[in-house]
A protein has these predicted regions:
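Gly/Pro-rich turn-and-neighbor structural signature
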Residues: 1-30, 45, 148, 152-207, ...
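N-terminal extension/subdomain marker
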Residues: 1-188
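Generic recognition of flexible, low-complexity loop/linker segments
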Residues: 22-29, 55, 204-209, 215-216, ...
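Catalytic or ion-translocation cores adjacent to nucleophile or general acid/base/metal-coordination motifs
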Residues: 57-106, 177-217, 224-305
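Long, compositionally biased intrinsically disordered regions
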Residues: 305-363
């Protein structure tokens, strides 16, 4: 049996090398500057979307650990909770806070008022639920509404999710955030010193092999999963981020690499980043293969055609992957089915996770 396994492995290895060789020869002859470069986590779920994107245009994709080399503890803006966005074997060295990004005072006030309303209603509900005299009245009052919600969640999960999201946004508009990471002289536990920012920037760029040939637009893609009522949800998120979404880590590195002081220091270390190169962050949803581009206000002005085409191609790559995955799931309507799986609270395995990983290539 062991000899048969070894023979099967050898045959697979030879077949894989024959498949990869033409792609290696093609990549060695490419000299044209890429329109955009996208950096994904070295996760098996990133590979299909990387292949799909590279087929669609003058794009190049790269891989790196999803925490992008910076071990941080993040304080979330919305919940106020902290999370460690680094591998569990590492201790976070820095604390960064999420702050609203380019928000006017009216929108900020509306968000805070809505947040206060939701917090107050939550406290009232908890008081009524656990008070000695009121639980029965609470059930009689809200039971029918909760029953209706359960039926809708079971029969129309996508509609229920959209409605819930719309109501939440109406009460407290969702704000885009960015990490606040500059070193605080009054609180040395918060932020990252400029010298350390430079060191991390150099290390990450060299490790991912990106020291020349920079595109105008470089997207750092963290990743995470969407699932409902799943006790194993964190296992589907980014392992390099400690079972959290990797969006904040991507935003942090993008902001560091866009800093003039950091680029000047990198120049002295032999890494020249062109002035027309911009780094931006994104989040790859591994359940649906959608990619959300963060805070692209500036880049829309500088490269509107490039950004618009990238959005179109990312959507096409998503559809292509959904179709490929849907065939394996025997689904008649792959996109709708995969979207439903991410929102269905009865779905214990909304995505393929790390299954079907046959080989790991270090190059």
């Amino acid at each position: 049996v062991l000899e048969q396994l070894k023979e099967n492995e050898k045959n697979y290895e030879q077949t894989l090398l024959k498949t990869l060789l033409p792609a290696v020869k093609r990549s060695a002859t490419i000299t044209k500057r890429a329109d955009a470069q996208l950096v994904f986590c070295i996760d098996v779920r990133s590979e299909p979307i990387r292949r799909a994107i590279e087929r669609l245009g003058n794009y190049e994709t790269l891989g790196f650990a999803g925490f992008f080399g910076i071990p941080i503890r993040v304080q979330e803006f919305e919940s106020g909770k902290t999370k460690d966005c680094c591998p569990v074997l590492l201790k976070p060295r820095y604390r960064v806070d999420e702050k609203p990004y380019e928000v006017n005072s009216f929108l900020m006030e509306q968000h805070q008022q809505g947040k206060t309303i939701k917090t107050t209603l939550g406290k009232i509900y908890q008081e009524l639920k656990y008070n000695f005299a009121t639980p029965f009245a609470l059930v009689e009052t809200l039971g029918a509404w909760y029953g209706l919600k359960m039926v809708l969640q079971a029969l129309a999960p996508s509609y229920t999710k959209k409605t819930s999201h719309a109501l939440n946004h109406l009460i407290a508009p969702q704000l885009q955030t960015e990490p606040s990471f500059e070193l605080d002289e009054d609180n040395l536990e918060h932020g990252i010193a400029l010298s350390e920012q430079i060191d991390y920037a150099e290390t990450v760029l060299r490790l991912m092999g990106l020291t020349s040939g920079f595109a105008k637009l470089i997207i750092l893609c963290g990743h995470g999963s969407t699932t409902e009522n799943n006790p194993y949800a964190s296992a589907l998120d980014c392992g390099a981020c400690g079972g959290n979404h990797g969006g904040t880590n991507a935003k942090l590195l993008a902001r560091i690499l866009n800093k003039i002081d950091v680029r000047r220091a990198l120049e002295e270390k032999g890494i020249h980043i062109p002035m027309d190169t911009l780094f931006y962050a994104a989040l790859h949803n591994t359940t649906t293969d959608s990619i959300e581009l963060y805070n692209l206000n500036t880049v829309k002005v500088l490269y509107p055609n490039l950004v618009n085409q990238l959005r179109v191609d990312l959507e096409e790559a998503k559809s292509s992957n959904n179709l490929e995955r849907g065939q394996k799931l025997n689904s008649a309507h792959p996109e709708q089915d995969i979207q439903r799986r991410s929102q269905d609270w009865s779905e214990t395995r909304p995505e393929w996770g790390l299954a079907r990983n046959a080989a790991f290539i270090v190059a």
